[in-house]
């Protein structure tokens, strides 16, 4: 299969097995492991494309379900596709909309042909199938598009998960058949199976036989404990081809990025940095800071003294706290900028540690500084 997406493996860390690579796309080549900021509605909330480039973002994520509802994939196509519509000339990945259908809609009915559900905005009845999800993504024009999968809840029974995995495999085949722009867009398959090793094995075998240009590990970061996620990754990533990129969906806390890379993951995405930024929480080299707390009212130091981002070079904790407390948009911009920058730079450090065969040492140092080694450590 000819594909516009190619993965080049540069080096494997001797200490951990983590992979240093390059993801080649129609809109540039980007080093992995990488963190992909999420721009659900064709914008990373409060941040401009120029700012994202300034930070070193390579691929960003947009959401098929939301863009289908607003403004409509036909309008995006008319604009020349997502790249032209949002003025972003680097990589874009769109998810299939499956997760939103399963998480946002209170009413949904899963049939073999697809999913019937209600629009979360106005209650209208809608239907999304593998063919429709692929058609929408073809119109949106991202570099990487995702197969439409069923996203089971956690926990799910073995029998339910087995049926779900089999359906996801059949849907993946239908997505491939419906894909009309395979010379311009790489379609990735999504491995499901919950925490059941034999079902992950079955799902991976089914999808690898279809020869996708890349594979995602789905169904994680849905409420399971971190040790369960790590265990699932340990038995799932070895089932995937070494010459294809591996994408862990919906994961963005610093500890999970490092632990995912150690387990052979190349790509990550999450709304976490902008979502917690809007609530006044920031990630720093010394751990997380809840900037709304009273202790920062007279703190005239940067959010993170070890960070050289725009926010930390120019503004103090006291000022940012004032903005957030007053619901000023600029405060949200400053915390969001810093958090996205923090994760992009963290992945640069991870890549450097892989080059130097010292990722396990880096993990230990980072966890100690950040506070992940403490009892009752916070997730981010």
Curated annotation (Swiss-Prot):
- Top-level taxon in the UniProt lineage: Bacteria
Q: Which reaction is this enzyme known to catalyze? A: 7-aminomethyl-7-carbaguanine + guanosine(34) in tRNA = 7-aminomethyl-7-carbaguanosine(34) in tRNA + guanine
InterPro entries, per the entry: ArchSynthase1/Queuine_TRR, TGT, TGT-like_sf, tRNA_ribo_trans-like
GO CC terms on record? cytosol
Listed binding positions for substrate are 95-99, 149, 192, 219
* Function, in words: Catalyzes the base-exchange of a guanine (G) residue with the queuine precursor 7-aminomethyl-7-deazaguanine (PreQ1) at position 34 (anticodon wobble position) in tRNAs with GU(N) anticodons (tRNA-Asp, -Asn, -His and -Tyr). Catalysis occurs through a double-displacement mechanism. The nucleophile active site attacks the C1' of nucleotide 34 to detach the guanine base from the RNA, forming a covalent enzyme-RNA intermediate. The proton acceptor active site deprotonates the incoming PreQ1, allowing a nucleophilic attack on the C1' of the ribose to form the product.
Q: What is this protein called?
A: Queuine tRNA-ribosyltransferase
């Amino acid at each position: 299969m000819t594909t516009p997406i190619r993965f080049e493996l540069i080096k494997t860390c001797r200490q951990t097995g983590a992979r240093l690579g390059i993801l080649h796309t129609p809109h540039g080549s980007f080093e992995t492991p990488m963190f992909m900021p999420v721009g659900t509605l064709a914008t990373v909330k409060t941040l401009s494309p120029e700012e994202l480039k300034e930070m070193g973002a390579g691929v960003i994520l947009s959401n098929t379900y939301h863009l289908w509802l607003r403004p409509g994939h036909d309008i995006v196509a008319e604009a020349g596709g997502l790249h032209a519509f949002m003025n972003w000339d680097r990589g874009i990945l769109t998810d299939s909309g499956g997760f939103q259908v399963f998480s946002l809609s209170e009413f949904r009915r899963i049939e073999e042909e697809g999913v019937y559900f209600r629009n979360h905005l106005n209650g209208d009845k809608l239907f999304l199938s593998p063919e429709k999800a692929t058609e929408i993504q073809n119109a949106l024009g991202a570099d990487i598009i995702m197969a439409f999968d069923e996203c089971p809840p956690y926990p799910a029974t073995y029998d339910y998960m087995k049926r779900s995995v089999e359906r996801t495999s059949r849907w993946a085949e239908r997505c491939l058949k419906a894909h009309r722009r395979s010379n311009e867009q790489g379609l990735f398959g999504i491995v499901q199976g919950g925490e059941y090793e034999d079902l992950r094995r079955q799902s991976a075998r089914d999808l690898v036989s279809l020869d996708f240009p890349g594979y995602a590990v789905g169904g994680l970061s849905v409420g399971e404990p971190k040790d369960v996620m790590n265990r699932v990754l340990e038995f799932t990533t070895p089932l995937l081809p070494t010459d294809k990129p591996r994408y862990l969906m919906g994961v963005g806390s610093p500890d999970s990025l490092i632990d995912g890379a150690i387990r052979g993951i190349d790509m990550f995405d999450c709304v976490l940095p902008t979502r917690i930024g809007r609530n006044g929480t920031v990630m720093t080299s010394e751990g997380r800071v809840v900037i709304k707390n009273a202790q920062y009212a007279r703190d005239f130091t940067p959010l993170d003294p070890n960070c050289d981002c725009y926010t930390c070079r120019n503004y103090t904790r006291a000022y940012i706290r004032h903005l957030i407390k007053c619901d000023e948009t600029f405060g949200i911009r400053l915390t969001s900028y810093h958090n996205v920058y923090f994760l992009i730079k963290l992945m640069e450090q991870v890549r450097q540690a892989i080059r130097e065969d010292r990722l396990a040492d880096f993990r230990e140092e980072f966890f100690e500084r950040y506070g992940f080694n403490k009892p009752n450590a916070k997730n981010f």
